[in-house]
Amino acid sequence: MKIKEITEFINNGVTVEEQTCDTYKIGNEENEVKKVAVTMFATVDNIKKMKEWGADFVIVHEPTFYDHFDNKFSEDVVVKEKYKLLEEAGITIYRWHDHSHCDKPDRIFEGKIYYLGLKGDEKRTNWGGSTVLTLDEAMTASEIVKLIEDKLNVRNLRVAGELNKKTTPIL
């Protein structure tokens, strides 16, 4: 299967703005795929792990080169290292951001809710198409932070507001 066939499949039926960041960042969409890796961030460490694993196609959600539309910071030492690693490994990178958020339901939001085990009613907002979850049972910000830390193994979260106030709507 070719890389472009995979991107056509995951984008099928989803309409996005004409100016989208969902593009190939490096590599060739005509290449045949042997191993696909999916990651939120194409960090140098992640690229090294994907290279070691033998991935030839990577689907990434956030910018690879530090700008929403991946305008190149060509003199940046980290950007240079990423390019070198990706070229050496023969990895094609496709950013899958807008399609994932424009689908109904929002696939990224759905994944977060699923892995956190939260239950509630989801609604799209008028503020940039964000999705809000109104929880079935109110939780405090402290409880939500603890849940994220425990379920997603994330540390050092920052919270603005009252940590012990119960809430039902969350973004």
Segments the model singles out, each with a brief description of its role:
Residues M1-L171:
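Hydrophobic structural segments
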